Every structure is written in C-alpha cells, then in structure tokens.
Amino acid sequence: MTLALQYKRILLKVSGEALMGGQSFGIDVFVADRIATDIAEVRAMGVEVAIVIGGGNIFRGVAVASHGGDRVTGDHMGMLATAINSLALRTSLTKLGVETVVLSAVAMPQICESFSQRKAIGYMNQGKVVIFAGGTGNPFFTTDSAATLRAAEIGADVLLKGTQVDGIYSADPKIDPTAKRFDQLTHVEILQWGLSVMDTTAVTLARENNVPIIVYSIHEKGGLAKVLNGTGRFTMVSE
C-alpha cells in the first residue's frame, strides 16, 4: 500500500509478546530498545505518540480463570504486568533522550502517575510520549479495548497495532499458507467475518468513535515510520 498518510497524534498498541523477542517469557531489553528507537524516529518527525502495552509476556488474567481461579484477581495481576512493561519501555525511550511519562489506570503513586484525560493530552501537547499502563483499570477488558478507549479519549488520529505479521489475514498465515491478506477493511467487515485482529469490544468501540486502525508488523526495524509515510505494508481499517 502506498497511500500517503498524515497523522499528528497516534496511539500505538504493543503486545506484551512483542517484548519477549526470542524468549519464552519476560522482556528482551534489545527488543524494547529497538521498539523505542522506532518510536523515537516518528516522534522526531513531529508525531505525538501515546502507547498501550499488553502484559501477556508476563501474565494473562484468563490463565487464572482457566485453572479455576478468580478472573478478577487474574486481570488485576495482568494490569500489574502492563505496568512492568510500561516502565521497561519508558526506560528504553529515556535512554534515547525521549521524554516519556507513564500514566496508570490503577493508582500506584510511588511508581507512576494516575491517568486522566486532561493530563495525558497536556503531556502530549508538551511533546512527551505518554504510556498508558493498567489497561482500562477494570477486569474483563483486554488491552486492545484499553488502546481503543485511550485513542478515543485523547483524540488520536489513528490507532496502530503492532503485531507478529504485516497486516490482517483471513487466517493465521503461520498456520494456513493460503490465508488471504487484506490491504483495506472496514470495522464492520472485521466483525462480520470474525477476523481475529482485536476483540469485538475493541473493534466496536473504534467503529462507534470513528477511530481508524492500522495493523502492521512491529518486528520490522523502522516499520512504524514507513507505515506513517505510507510506504510500509499494513492493513487499514476504516469506515
């Protein structure tokens, strides 16, 4: 896709798994540094950047429920995992000289500030990167839903989801080599066809608030800037 894109404010969703690199658990510091370098590159282009990070590299709340435990407690543990990842990415960005603030949906004043919409927008207007930790602050909601919610709250021009592949496919291309890749889709098509790019709540929230979604591979060095320049490979989701 070669459509030229012009975005002033973006929200980037990074999965926790992306931070693992080749590991089976935790954070690969070199991967975190590379992702931070991509973010610093687009920040230098004048783009305002907010980020939501998942926690799946450390813990998933559904894992507790699947073993007979309390889902709410499990999701609270997952929220803490997103805070760990947020602090790690802030560290990587700070090393590059990028001013970064972590705002959490769950109060932890000795570690980071609590989220408020006005505070987030204020920091972005100052040129700082803002990382949203703690998901939505409520159980039963994914970090994809949190990303869509925050994108709507801060008035982001687009929500970018960095994934393991270079767009949205009809099936997992790592499993099905015949899977069809899409250049463009609508929110309704994702919902109707049951495409597994985001959960239904996240896609519906994006549709209702006119938040376009771009899905691209987070593993390509410099890939974020390429997408924003319209030269990368990605899938655009809009109405």
From Swiss-Prot:
Q: GO MF terms on file?
A: ATP binding; UMP kinase activity
- Origin superkingdom: Bacteria
Q: Which residues bind UMP?
A: G55, D75, T136, G137, N138, P139, F140, F141, T142, T143
What processes in GO biological process is this protein linked to? 'de novo' CTP biosynthetic process; UDP biosynthetic process
Q: What is the activity regulation comment for this entry?
A: Inhibited by UTP.
List the cysteine pairs that form cystine: none
Subunit structure, interactors included: Homohexamer.
Return the InterPro entries for the record: AceGlu_kinase-like_sf (IPR036393), Asp/Glu/Uridylate_kinase (IPR001048), Uridylate_kinase (IPR011817), Uridylate_kinase_bac (IPR015963)
Q: What organism does this protein naturally occur in?
A: Bartonella quintana (strain Toulouse)
Q: Which Gene3D superfamilies match?
A: Acetylglutamate kinase-like
- Gene from which the chain derives: pyrH
What name does this protein carry? Uridylate kinase
Catalyzed reactions per annotation: UMP + ATP = UDP + ADP
